[in-house]
């Protein structure tokens, strides 16, 4: 049985860092120290295989009062096809610290269908949103 924990001490940061730095389209090249700082200052969700190995991850940046940004969501390739991304999102979406918030945001290139199942929609007023983007923060171009 796969399990999910919000305990950052349980994370296999080597596995999480490898995926984000080497395989993700959004955080390629992220330094380990940057990931460690992000984990320390976020609500994290580790997805674990029955043998305890890291199978997936999600991170939420939030003030726990009005806003949450969902990011760094992934299930490792060897564990895909088992509805685990939905299990991970169910844990995120039902977490007590994320209830009653005015707004949840995320960015995705390829998982719109998954997130729409949890109430995410296109921005209602995209003209209201701006970003200050650093296109190559880790020395390696990223896709978002």
Predicted regions and their residues:
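Conserved active-site alpha-helix within GNAT-family acetyltransferase domains
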Residues: 86, 98-134
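Short amphipathic alpha-helix that is part of the acyltransferase structural core
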Residues: 1-30, 48, 126, 141-144
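Short, flexible, glycine-rich and Lys/Arg-enriched loop motifs at helix boundaries
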Residues: 1-8, 12, 90, 94-103
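A conserved beta-strand-loop-helix scaffold within acyl/acetyltransferase catalytic domains
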Residues: 33-51, 55-74
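Conserved acetyl-CoA pyrophosphate-binding loop and the N-cap/start of the following alpha-helix
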Residues: 79-88
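A charged, well-structured terminal subsegment
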Residues: 136-139
């Amino acid at each position: 049985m796969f399990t999910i924990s919000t305990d950052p001490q349980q994370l296999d940061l080597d596995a999480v860092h490898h995926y984000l730095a080497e395989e993700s389209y959004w955080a390629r090249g992220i330094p380990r120290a940057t990931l460690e700082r992000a984990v320390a200052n976020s609500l994290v969700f580790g997805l674990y295989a029955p043998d305890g190995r890291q199978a997936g991850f999600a991170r939420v940046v939030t003030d726990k009062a009005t806003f949450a940004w969902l990011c760094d969501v992934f299930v490792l390739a060897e564990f895909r096809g088992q509805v685990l991304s939905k299990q991970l999102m169910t844990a995120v979406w039902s977490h007590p610290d994320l209830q009653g918030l005015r707004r949840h945001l995320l960015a995705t290139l390829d998982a719109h269908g998954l997130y729409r199942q949890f109430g995410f929609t296109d921005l209602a007023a995209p003209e209201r949103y701006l970003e200050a983007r650093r296109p190559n923060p880790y020395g390696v171009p990223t896709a978002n």
